[in-house]
């Protein structure tokens, strides 16, 4: 795998990953890949692997920037990694087996730009890039 602007985040078992990469005409792709780098699913939204967690074979949690248009105006992932851009995220639970997309957080306040998602019991933990504090959301 050698796509331009590529970022990959692997599941804790190393069998699945989430890949962000540049495509033609200043567009980007975000997809689920296997351990050979083969696309298993393409998502209709854009986000970065460090804003997601693969928690099981068909469960993914993602913080997704609400303003998807920003991806056409900036250079990614460079601007993001250099902290030149911050997002206002919605947080979602994705069930690939049942093709479900459940909203966990979509409030206007506080501003959330979530990274480093982890599960602890029935809580989704993450760091908010705005203040570098630990936050949590109840999950089912």
Regions found by a protein language model. Name each.
Residues 116-140:
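C-terminal amphipathic "assembly/sorting" segment characterized by alternating charged
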Residues 1-20, 45-60, 109-125:
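Conserved beta-propeller blade repeats
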Residues 29, 35-72:
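Active-site/pore-lining binding-face segments in mid-to-C-terminal subdomains
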Residues 64-86:
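Short, conserved, GDST-rich strand-edge loop motifs in beta-rich repeat architectures
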Residues 19-20, 63-65, 127-129, 137:
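Residue-level marker for isolated small/hydroxyl-bearing positions within beta-strands
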Residues 1-6, 32-48, 95-112, 140:
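Multi-bladed beta-propeller domains
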Residues 22-28, 82-88, 130:
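Short, solvent-exposed loop/turn segments at conserved positions within beta-propeller repeat blades
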Residues 8, 27-33, 62, 89-93, ...:
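Hydrophobic beta-strand positions in blades of beta-propellers and related beta-sheet-rich domains
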